[in-house]
Amino acid sequence: MGCANSHGHSELKITKPAPEEGVTHCGPWLKHPEDIKDYPKFPAEYSKSLLCKALTKDVWEACKGRKDAAGVSFETCILSGCQNVDSGIGCYAGSHDSYTTFAPLFDKIMEMYHKHGTTAKHVSCMDASQLNCPPLPEDEAAMIVSTRIRVGRNLADYPLGPGISDAQRIEVMTRVTKAFENYTGDLAGQFYALNKLSKKEKDQLIADHFLFK
């Protein structure tokens, strides 16, 4: 069917259709957001992504050509899914504001993926004693060699992946490292910049299951 390239995207063997008035044929030949000039049309055999299901002509007309508060265009948000037509979801928010500016699309996708609508209320509880996590039976617990929990967060007022610039990435790293310097006790730790790791540090982090090959 295809294989993954160095960026993790699949390389499908599909033929670019002949031009068709009023639509942009989706596929790996799309390289830039500006290439999506008209309503995206997905190959019939690759129409299972949430983007394909949610991106009706009405949604396209409501969002096309618009930009969110960070300056990220709607076409930028959907480019990956239009390029990689076998995607599961197929879109990326360019900033926190994308969810508001492009709500006609993102609301539908979140409802399909998370199974709740825009009226649902998120309830936060930071009391660990309220967690319903009974101990595992001894035979099951014995099979666990190590566990790893990854927590990802985004800084307010910065674009997300598709919209952030190299300069902003450096700014985020600078702010985060300065904040880490003030952490003590259980929050204390070590910050590692991937582009500055020595081989010894890299090997040790891999051995400790913090860094993956």
Model-assigned labels for residue ranges:
Residues G2-K213:
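Long, Pro/Ser/Thr-rich low-complexity/intrinsically disordered regulatory tracts in eukaryotic proteins
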